[in-house]
Amino acid sequence: MSEVYEGAIGIDLGTTYSCVAVWETANVEIIPNDQGARTTPSFVAFTETERLVGDAAKNQAAMNPRNTVFDAKRLIGRRYEDPETQKDIKHWPFKVIDNNGIPTIEVNYLGEKKQFTAQEISAMVLTKMKEISEAKLNKRVEKAVITVPAYFSDSQRAATKDAGAIAGLNVLRIINEPTAAAIAYGLDAKSDKPKNVLIFDLGGGTFDVSLLKIQGGVFEVLATAGDTHLGGEDFDNALVEHFIQEFKRKQKIDISDDPRALRRLRSACERAKRALSSVTQTTVEVDSLSNGIDFSSSITRARFEDINATTFKATIDPVAKVLKDSKVPKADVHDIVLVGGSTRIPKVQRLVSDFFDGRALNKSINPDEAVAYGAAVQAAVLTNKADSDKTQDLLLLDVVPLSLGVAMEGNVFGVVCPRNTPIPTIKKRTFTTVADNQTTVTFPVYQGERVNCAENEPLGEFQLTGIPPMPRGQAELEATFELDANGILKVTAVEKTTGRSAHIEITNSVGHLSSTKIQEMIENADKFKQQDKDFAKKLEAKSQLESYISNIETTISEPNVMMKLKRGDKSKIEAQLAECMSQLELEDTNTDALRKAELRLKRTVQKAFASLR
């Protein structure tokens, strides 16, 4: 397709599932994938012959656990030694190695060991979402708005933007998931009176709570809180651990080091978790779980709630935090909107309702699609495709999720930009030298809420040199923190007497890639895409040849043909059939060889049958 789509798509890049939407004819359309599903598993699988993305990857996960990658969102922009990363590695069947502090996924693909970053895996999922939209629009898609959890750090946001670039997308904006969901909620319910709306977004792997003031088309985030490492996957993990222990107790077999058994048990636990949102008891069944032993166990909703009690309760702390940060009393929250598949869990709904003194919760928007919906609206606004009264005054005012600053003497965190500051923004703070005649100052940049920098996240550092020698404390060094609409940071420092300056765009933090590295990954992605196309063509040629062989074998076996066909001609056809079968059995055969074999067989058949006329 040569025609380029003028607008942009909205993508909800989820931990477990992703969703894509587009603004068309004054409305948002959620685009189904080739299976007809409106959400696509965020899974990528590698085999000896091909790469699979989405449903096809998830469906074969139990047979190929070590080479089926999921949860890339839990790795993106994180360091290998991060405690959360280490915790996750214990649950994943695929291998994650330390590559200079960057967690890197190692798989077997096309008979070789290959290594991929979380950005590259995410880019493969984004490419799939891009292709889904292109199939619908019949145009090439080049622009997108991608959503991230509100509590994502600068590194995680930048890494997500890089993933978009690797997928061949111009990422117009990174927007926060709860803000996108608020658009889905508020677009059709505009009011001139201000409304305080709490978005409770509990997905497959991340959790956000945002409080917004919505008035007309203005969506102003007052405060945000959450946990980038809490969601449905954690509830699955707890169930899996529960049943591992039960199987061990009953059968004296430990399956914790058996990736295939774990994948099958995880799938059964995920189904049970979903079922328990609508029934009070269900059964977890896995045929031949280990050593030919079938596993079957019933679980009640009450037991499921008990197993996850601590995790469920942890979802309420961020709710209290946003109300405290925004100084908005419970009673002044007009609506509590549930977003994310995990909000279907009755216990979660009860906890939220109880916190708000038994208030009814708003379930008016589709929890799986709301975020992509809001992203599509923002995409339409940014590309001037939003041609509706509903969107003409739309304005998003988001906030910084975590404080930003620099390390001062004693490794104390000097906050420059406090959390919940509206973005885009520019914040300044003056620092000074700590030693006499100091001519160089290093500015280590951090993000977090702790006093000790060691307990916050390092984003990068830069040096300001050429400071005139003077007694300690006399130099005036002004640090400027500039945050763009994506929440991505640029820091500048100026020595006021000389005007000498230095700056850093946070690009050397873990997760953010250099432009050279991104280009290299784009080329790799194109190479994999070509390999996928080549494999599909080979499969088609193989299938076509097999079908033709079958037809010819049937034809020459028919009595009336056998009687008329010359013995020599039949022998030639049989020889060609044998040659074609040999070609099909070759491991390293290619599309060209298969097509040539089919052509030779066709010519032999045509010559033989010409003599029958």
UniProtKB/Swiss-Prot annotation:
UniProt-annotated stretches for the region Nucleotide binding domain (NBD): 1-390
InterPro entries: ATPase_NBD, Heat_shock_70_CS, HSP70_C_sf, HSP70_peptide-bd_sf, Hsp_70_fam
PROSITE patterns listed in its UniProt record: HSP70_1 (PS00297), HSP70_2 (PS00329), HSP70_3 (PS01036)
Quaternary structure annotation from Swiss-Prot or TrEMBL: Binds to ribosomes. Binds close to the ribosomal tunnel exit via contacts with both ribosomal proteins and rRNA. Directly interacts with nascent polypeptides. This interaction is dependent on the ribosome-associated complex (RAC). Interacts with pss1. Interacts with fes1.
Localisation per UniProt entry: Cytoplasm
SUPFAM superfamilies: Actin-like ATPase domain, Heat shock protein 70kD (HSP70), C-terminal subdomain, Heat shock protein 70kD (HSP70), peptide-binding domain
Name of the coding gene: sks2
Protein name in UniProt: Ribosome-associated molecular chaperone sks2
Domain of life: Eukaryota
Record bears the keyword Lipoprotein: no
One Pfam family of this chain: HSP70
Keyword set, alphabetical order: ATP-binding, Chaperone, Cytoplasm, Hydrolase, Nucleotide-binding, Phosphoprotein, Protein biosynthesis
Molecular functions per Gene Ontology: ATP binding; ATP hydrolysis activity; ATP-dependent protein folding chaperone; heat shock protein binding; protein folding chaperone; unfolded protein binding
Enzyme class: hydrolase
Region (Substrate binding domain (SBD)) location: 402-612
Family membership noted in the UniProt record: Belongs to the heat shock protein 70 family. Ssb-type Hsp70 subfamily.
Catalytic function, reaction form: ATP + H2O = ADP + phosphate + H(+)
Region feature (Inter-domain linker): 391-401
